[in-house]
Each structure stands twice: as C-alpha cells, then as structure tokens.
Amino acid sequence: MNGDHSLAVHALVYLDHRATHLPSQILAENICTNAARVRKVMRPLASAGLIATKEGAEGGYALARPAAEITLRAVAEATGTTFVKVNWTPGDVHEDCLVSSSMGAVMNDIYAGLNRTCLEQLEHTTIHDITEQISASAKANNPARFP
C-alpha cells in the first residue's frame, strides 16, 4: 500500500472541515506534501465524483457530496488502493512438489481476502466520521484551544 489513500482521506477531511474550495497548495501545506502529489491523488477522486474542481482565483477542490456520504471504501476504490500487496510469494508453480507449486496461489488468495475485508470495514466509516472524531479528540485534549 502506498500513501495515496491516507493522503486522499486527509484532503477530504480537511475539505469537510474548511467547507470551502481549497487550492492544491493549501491542501499540500496541511497534508505536509507537495501540490503536485495532491493534484495527482485528487484526479481520481474527481473522476469518481467524490470532489468537484473549480478553476480560477477562487478555484480549487471541494467535496462533491456531503462528507457523511463518502465512505473510506469509496476513497480506496477511487485511488485504486490495495492494502495488502506482496511482491513475492514462496514456491514455484513449475516444481514437482505439492507445497511449492501451490503456495503462491494459496497465499495470494489469503491476501485477496484481506483486501476484501479491509474494503468491507472501510464501508462503515465516512469522511464525516473522521472529521467528527478529530474534532472530539481535539476538544477533549485541548478544550481551551478548541471550545
């Protein structure tokens, strides 16, 4: 898994928090990355209809629908995120050994199941849920700063 899913979730939560169009540079500063990377990650979110884009001086990105309707699964699917990805599996399909010739396929099935489980879990969490969790945590830990 690369960081695109986390970056996308961060950007969407910040857009929910600010409730306005924000340019990639402002998002990048808050995410602690560069604007080019933000634009790269935001493109598939726009294609999936999760965000709206606007050009011009008041342009940037905004949520295309309420944050409570955007699940983390939708974000993962838009960004093409694979949570468990293994570049190598043991064994060799050409070996004359039951274990060696089967191990790769069995392990790949297990990893595919883990990815399905991740997506199923993410279906139950929305961008708004994360915004609320952050707000509640900030208020509990620093009530003077976040009344």
Region locations from a protein language model:
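N-terminal helix-turn-helix DNA-binding core of bacterial DNA-binding proteins
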Residues: 1-33, 52
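Key DNA-contact positions within bacterial/archaeal DNA-binding proteins
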Residues: 36
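Basic amphipathic alpha-helical segments that dock to polyanions
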Residues: 41-48
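Beta-hairpin "wing" of winged helix-turn-helix
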Residues: 49-64
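Conserved segment of winged-helix/HTH DNA-binding domains
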Residues: 67-92, 107-112
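C-terminal regulatory/oligomerization modules of transcriptional regulators
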Residues: 91-147
